[in-house]
A protein has these predicted regions:
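Conserved N-terminal segment of class I S-adenosyl-L-methionine
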Residues: 1-158, 162, 172-177, 181, ...
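Helix-to-beta-strand junctions that scaffold the AdoMet/dcAdoMet cofactor pocket
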Residues: 168-169, 182-184
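Short "lid" loop at the C-terminus of a central beta-strand within the Rossmann-like core
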Residues: 193-198
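A short His-aromatic
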Residues: 163, 167
């Protein structure tokens, strides 16, 4: 008997970053979430929906095709719903506060220009930054029900995006949205945890960050970041495996005071 009728995912796919051949590298149940990781065991019921991930042979980008046909309403219904905070308990309190503290302490120069928190969710980071003297910061989330659409015609010196890149199914579509907000000498400051060879050798299903119920569906390498940056007229750099930046020509002043690696 042929296994073909049972196949639910092709063995290879074109990379969403560079277009190169990508091979299957792992699978997890859709229900895999932060609550499971926090408990150290499976606490969410299995959904029976397998999420297959591919890894690009060229740039190393890891992605899934499972959500390619989803509309924003689908993400709102199945991921960013009333149960989301249970899967990501830092979402409403700890993370916005710690991110604002990090920016205020390490990159105070950002307060000298207009800032946009892209993918802002409830807008809590804006509140935390304003409380720390960042008075020209605004929020925008393309998937939020009540979002500030007045920013769509504005430009900003710095666009910040914490925990955004791993949530979007199409990296180039995400970049299209973000680049439109940049001033000519503006920069994007963002966080996402890079996927490493060690993670892939151990199995992506063992990696705590691979949690589709949390919306974690796209995972980058430095090569993948350089690829999407180049295609949008930007250069890429990283401070560490979790904090990165895109810029056009001149390195932003706030980046020069810290050790970093440039990928472009």
């Amino acid at each position: 008997m042929s296994l073909k009728p049972m196949c639910v995912a092709p063995e290879d796919s074109a990379c969403k970053c560079c277009g190169s051949t990508s091979r299957l590298c792992g699978v997890v149940d859709f229900s895999r979430c932060g609550a499971d990781h926090a408990a150290g065991k499976k606490v969410e019921p299995y959904s029976g929906v397998p999420i297959y991930y591919y890894r690009c042979e060229q740039c190393g980008f890891v992605f899934t095709r499972a959500f390619d046909n989803w509309e924003p309403e689908d993400f709102a219904r199945h991921i960013y719903n009333k149960d989301y905070e249970r899967h990501d308990p830092d979402y409403k309190g700890k993370r916005p506060s710690s991110n604002a503290e990090m920016i205020a302490n390490s990159f105070p120069e950002m307060a000298q220009g207009r800032m946009l928190d892209f993918g802002s969710g409830l807008g809590l980071l804006e509140c935390e930054l304003r409380a720390r003297g960042f008075l020209e910061v605004e929020s925008y989330d393309p998937y939020a029900t009540h979002t500030n659409t007045s920013v769509l015609s504005e430009k900003y010196k710095t666009v910040v995006a914490f925990e955004v890149f791993e949530h979007h199914p199409e990296p180039h579509a995400l970049m299209d949205m973000m680049v439109r907000f940049l001033e000519e000498d503006g920069a994007i400051f963002f966080s996402t945890l890079l996927v490493t060879e060690r993670v892939l050798e151990a199995g992506i299903d063992k990696w705590w960050y691979c949690a589709p119920r949390n919306g974690h569906i796209s995972f980058f390498t430095s090569g993948a970041l350089a690829t999407i940056a180049h295609r949008h007229g930007l250069k890429a750099g990283s401070f560490n495996e979790g904090v990165h930046f895109f810029y056009r020509d001149a390195l932003p002043g706030w980046a020069t005071r810290y050790s970093h690696e440039l990928w472009s």
